[in-house]
């Protein structure tokens, strides 16, 4: 290779990332217009388009590099010099951290995810940690109650860029003040002030004002979801001020926010104070930088591995028929490998399973489907693998494993947030906790269905419980769109003997689903059956599912709330007039 080519390649990669992030910001900047026009289908399409941008631009850069090098192979020294030149371009670069991830992605595409070493890749960042502790321009604006909280909130709302008419601004402000007074008390509230992010966070059918409530005793989240009435008027649906509530809003089972972030590291650093339980990976994920979130997730895994003496074990729960799932006992993630062969009743291919996981990545997850990171050629030290798990890996996924002596390489796997399997949770709880779990499960099914997702396999073992008690779906191999399913009533038996026969007395075609049968799987436990009949009996009726299908086909997009119905101002305070 001619000398000087290394710098050209480094510059080409960085320019490619510039182009990618420019398009990322362009798609994001359209969020306000889509919200104001109530174009909810365009919201969904923009989300999918933005997810695809990264891989598309990686592909463009790879083609450029193949032209530059005329397809010639490169030696190790050449690659090290390319990375060295690239590193020198980053100290003054505003999106250095994602630029490093982009470099990694280009390298992996060029070399088929092989030789992934710290010398060749940015396994850890080359730049100082938390470089944006001080930021080049303010991300937020402070508001003080010099003339009272009503005046303060009027200024906050008047500063918003939204151009639609407000339904009742005075009412919403009084709702917020009432909530803050109940939360803090009048004296503490008078000594508190707000810091509000300059940019709104858009997702689904809401625009979120995100801020910090700075009180004498500490800083709290301050989140206002702004919605539209059917007449296109704005209203504030609630006010959330606890870290638990904020954590759910920014949760791993939700779609990514559309928020204009030319300095993503600075925004992540700003958010960290009101989301202390979120990892760096989860914060990047929440603002839509999912590929860099994957980098950060891998770094978090490496840091944990270096500081523990644990071995990987099979994950607790009922063993899956499609996926082999393992974990580290103290780590909050699970690792999922597609088995070489599936159970006979699972008539599908590995390609189908991967397509299902990609569908979930691109779809609105409505807070009910766990996000995943996909890895290729994932290296594990054998000393970190328990003998029982090693035996299981070789038994169930040998075709995906390469033995390197002291290491193994798993050709393909997913990493996902670890949860307590719902079937295990239900065995361990009683009383109100049991009731809450069944209510959550039914709500999860309803919200998935309203978002045009049918889980396929609705058994409790395919759902997990988060640390906030939310029920989330995580087994995607039978997932499909609601509109692809034929929901049928079971025909009445022709003769009394029909009900005793081993075979059904009616025809069953692919895609047929009989909701009446759900009762047999979900209500067998006498503790659970009555709760189901009380709260979710309509899930056992085919006409319920068909009605949802009709709404989806008519183009209706349901509202998705990242909080309980009882927290909505309209429920808490009613239509109080001010």
From Swiss-Prot:
Major localization listed first in the record, in broad terms: cytoplasm
Any one cellular-component term (Gene Ontology): cytoplasm
InterPro entries: AceK_kinase, AceK_regulatory, Isocitrate_DH_AceK
UniProt-recorded name of the protein: Isocitrate dehydrogenase kinase/phosphatase
Species of the source: Escherichia coli O157:H7
Keywords assigned by UniProt, alphabetized: ATP-binding, Cytoplasm, Glyoxylate bypass, Hydrolase, Kinase, Nucleotide-binding, Protein phosphatase, Serine/threonine-protein kinase, Transferase, Tricarboxylic acid cycle
EC numbers, comma separated: 2.7.11.5, 3.1.3.-
Recorded family membership: Belongs to the AceK family.
